Amino acid sequence: MTSTKDETVLGNARIVLTDRVIERGWIAFADGRIAEFGEGSGPAGSEDAAGDLIMPGLIELHTDHLEAHYVPRPKVFWDPIAAVVSYDGQLATSGITTVLDSLRVWREDGAEEVDGRAGLLANAITSARDANLLRSDHFLHLRCEIPMPSVVEEAKELVGRPDVRLMSLMDHTPGQRQFRDEGKLRAYYRGKGAGMTDAELDTLFERRFAYQKAYAATNMREIVALAHLHEIPLASHDDTTDENVTDAIRDRVSVAEFPTTIEAARGLHQAGIGILMGAPNVVRGGSHSGNIAAVDLAREGLLDILSSDYIPSSLLMAALQLPQHVAAIDLASAVRTVTKTPAEAVGLADRGEIAIGKRADLIRVHVARDIPVVRSVWREGYRVA
């Protein structure tokens, strides 16, 4: 990370605030904080932003893309610190200045491909951070697969870390939630890596049914209690039914990730639970697993936060596309779904908006042919990309 001057002033820019856009404005930041901004071309000597957007750095609550860098091919394991650095570079150049790295707390006998190696990757993130190798600000999101026998033990090993900002309650047992249609889940596994045979899938599904019956209820209570003990926000995952909504309310969930039906989304929203949907869902025009489209939820006023999920560049693309799909959403409110609202959801009050005194986590974005290009990225005032 390098900085060539104590103060940076950008002029001739479109400044995206929380409630409006300054169509021709300027912004100054120093000592890692936003100092001033206003209308007009800017003070003499301002760096010309050539009419580009200046936005808060994006805030990502749910991405498992680190796994693609650590295991770039089936059974090929990269150096974990090198994988973190590569992944971090992709995040930064996608405009993401704060990320909750989503680590799967999930160990399963006979299913090496779903072992997220959460502890190993968490330690690699720490090592990269301590060596000043990271451009984005990294926190952890522990994705707890509730039916797994060792999930409570593994979560306890990680939950005391100061960088844990979110825990989610997952249950990928076949025939429910995201994959109510078992056939779609079978197709998903057949398409992964070398694929799985029907016999292998039968064995996998039988084991997961048994795990859910034996462990899910007890593990759910213990994981929820663990999160509340450590004052870590909780997220539900793939809520589908009224029962799922009732459970989320009971467990004092603050964010609902990827509800699969509009009925569930309505119930969650009425309970004051923030709705998080996938940015790829917006960009592609629908869910890859055939569930509710994020744009349909947005039209109903049921979309609060976007997440890049599995492709970092989708976060910015989706935010800029939302106003094209939903008349009630303007650019400022669309940008809130990837900045201020996710920041508030996990208690990061010092960032996520352009306001005096907030962190100078900023991005400069050029848009051509409806494709956004991140020209520059600053984290706490330092140019990192």
Q: What label would you give each PLM region?
A:
Residues 106-239, 309:
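Metal-coordinating catalytic core of metallo-dependent amide/deamination hydrolases
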Residues 161-165, 248-255, 270-276, 301-304:
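Glycine-enriched alpha-helix->loop->beta-strand junction motifs that scaffold or abut catalytic
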Residues 49-121:
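Metal-associated gating/positioning segment near the N- to mid-region
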Residues 13, 32, 51, 95, ...:
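Glycine-centered positions in the ABC transporter ATPase nucleotide-binding domain
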Residues 59-61, 99-101, 138-142, 165-171, ...:
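Hydrophobic faces of well-ordered beta-strands that scaffold small-molecule active sites
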Residues 1-43:
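N-terminal metal-binding scaffold of metallo-dependent hydrolase/deaminase domains
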Residues 271-281, 285-366:
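His/Asp/Glu-enriched, well-ordered alpha-helical/loop segment
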Residues 142-153, 239-243, 247, 255-257, ...:
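Active-site glycine- and acidic-residue-rich loops that bind
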